[in-house]
């Protein structure tokens, strides 16, 4: 069958789609990836066939006032301490309004939707798999008669909050049932003769790649697949080609955005605290310029994460799904300094399961970070629990093993 994957131009979101794309390809299906032009190199680098459509989004160009409105509903979504607030009608409606006004129309811009629909109508895929913010994929699927599903790269917050919102909305008086996402999707789909249905918001089904302990209960039809982290095309550097008898720690992701790395002096103090660790610390990604670093700290712009973590005792990161999944896959303890979207939740879940420590970015400092590192490295129960989570993840079917199920669902939903 013909399978079309689609994602707005966000490299790490796309990377979460790659293992299933290749599973479908090696099963004999014709697979193409339609995305905004900025993603083309990443698609080609994954060895997949790219179809550039539309113009690039400008999500990260939104003005600070608008960003603040969006962040209210996407930062510090603390399920452990804000549960009542997060499930209130006011919060759920506010989230639907903010994302449907300032996020979804921006990443699904008019030219992207129109050209994606044109391509789908011409190529006639049997199945469209879409990244969960890329609602253009659902519209294109309905416009050409294809089956369609969301391919989740992380925690299903969109489906979870949409389900809670709809449950409360339908209990309200008929004259007071606003639906910002439904209104926006009705307008977008209507341009192509497609009527709104809830499947445009949540797919006809979803593919969830998180292990059982981390899945959110959405009540929606879901196909479970094993998380197989893909970190992008890469080359192993010389210093990483051979194993090392020295213990390693990895620090990656958004370091420069934390208060403990606000400037070169603060960054240097943070590194000095971490350097007390008996072993090598590999710091990846950009940070403030510093003239000197301790001898046991290696600063690198990029490193193949899957290769590095094979020989790491722990990782400190920002909670991103790809980094988290790679650490999970290798069974190492994780220290998450996270607050964005689903990053906080996974960090808290990992900590609750005894496989790591969660730290709030607005509270962490060099001392607390160094203390957490010592704790997860010196206490063997963290590694033991991380290995248990790895084993749990390995119990899920591989992407290749779910292909027959996707074929069956495609036959059921097509047309």
UniProtKB/Swiss-Prot annotation:
Catalysed transformations (reactions): dTDP-beta-L-mycarose + erythronolide B = 3-O-alpha-L-mycarosylerythronolide B + dTDP + H(+)
Cysteines joined through disulfide linkages: none
Record's keyword terms, sorted: Antibiotic biosynthesis, Glycosyltransferase, Transferase
Transmembrane intervals: none
Record carries keyword Transport: no
Highest taxon of source: Bacteria
Biological process (GO), any one: antibiotic biosynthetic process
A Gene Ontology molecular function term of the record: UDP-glycosyltransferase activity
EC number: 2.4.1.328
InterPro entries in UniProt: EryCIII-like_C, EryCIII-like_N, Glycosyl_450act, Glycosyltransferase_28, UDP_glucos_trans
Pfam families: EryCIII-like_C (PF06722), EryCIII-like_N (PF21036)
Alphabetical list of SUPFAM superfamilies matching this protein: UDP-Glycosyltransferase/glycogen phosphorylase
Gene3D superfamilies for the chain: Glycogen Phosphorylase B (3.40.50.2000)
Function of the protein: Involved in the biosynthesis of the macrolide antibiotic erythromycin. Catalyzes the reversible transfer of mycarosyl from dTDP-beta-L-mycarose to erythronolide B to yield 3-alpha-L-mycarosylerythronolide B. It can also use TDP-beta-L-cladinose.
NCBIfam families linked: glycosyl_450act
Additional detail: It does not require an auxiliary activator protein.
PANTHER family with a match to the protein in the record: STEROL 3-BETA-GLUCOSYLTRANSFERASE (PTHR48050), STEROL 3-BETA-GLUCOSYLTRANSFERASE UGT80A2 (PTHR48050:SF13)
Record family assignment: Belongs to the glycosyltransferase 28 family.
Name of the protein: Erythronolide mycarosyltransferase
Gene this chain is encoded by: eryBV
């Amino acid at each position: 069958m013909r399978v079309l994957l689609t994602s707005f131009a966000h490299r790490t979101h796309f990377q979460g789609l790659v293992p299933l794309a290749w599973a479908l390809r090696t099963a004999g299906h014709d697979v193409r990836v339609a995305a905004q032009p900025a993603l083309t190199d990443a698609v080609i680098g994954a060895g997949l066939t790219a179809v550039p459509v539309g113009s690039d989004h400008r999500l990260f160009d939104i003005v600070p006032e608008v960003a603040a409105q969006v962040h209210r509903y996407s930062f510090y979504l603390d399920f452990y301490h804000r549960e009542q607030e997060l499930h209130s009608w006011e919060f759920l409606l506010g989230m639907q309004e903010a994302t449907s006004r300032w996020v979804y129309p921006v990443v699904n811009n008019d030219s992207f939707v129109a050209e994606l629909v044109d391509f789908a109508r011409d190529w006639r895929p049997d199945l469209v798999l879409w990244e969960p913010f890329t609602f253009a994929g659902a519209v294109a699927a309905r416009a050409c008669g294809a089956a369609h599903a969301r391919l989740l790269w992380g925690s299903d917050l969109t489906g979870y909050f949409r389900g809670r919102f709809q449950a409360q909305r339908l209990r309200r008086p008929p004259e007071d049932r606003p639906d910002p996402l439904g209104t926006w999707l009705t307008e977008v789909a209507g341009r192509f003769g497609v009527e709104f249905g809830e499947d445009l918001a949540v797919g006809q089904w979803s593919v969830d790649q998180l292990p059982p302990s981390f899945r959110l209960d959405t009540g929606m039809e879901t196909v479970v697949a094993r998380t197989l982290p893909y970190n992008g095309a890469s080359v192993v550097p010389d210093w990483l080609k051979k194993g090392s008898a020295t213990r390693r720690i990895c620090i990656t992701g958004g370091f420069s955005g934390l208060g403990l790395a606000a400037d070169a002096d603060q960054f240097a103090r943070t590194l000095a605290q971490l350097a007390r660790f008996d072993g090598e610390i590999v710091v990846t990604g950009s940070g403030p310029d510093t003239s000197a670093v301790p001898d046991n700290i290696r600063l690198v712009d990029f490193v193949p994460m899957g290769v590095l973590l094979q020989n790491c005792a722990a990782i400190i990161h920002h909670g991103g799904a790809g980094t988290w999944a790679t650490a999970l896959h290798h069974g190492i303890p994780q220290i998450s300094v996270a607050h964005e979207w689903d990053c906080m939740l996974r960090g808290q879940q990992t900590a609750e399961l005894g496989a790591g420590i969660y730290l709030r970015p607005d509270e962490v400092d060099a001392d607390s970070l160094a203390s957490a590192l010592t704790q997860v490295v010196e206490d063997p129960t963290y590694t033991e629990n991380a290995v248990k989570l790895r084993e749990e993840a390995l119990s899920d079917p591989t992407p290749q093993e779910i292909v027959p199920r996707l074929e069956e669902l495609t036959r059921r939903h097509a047309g």
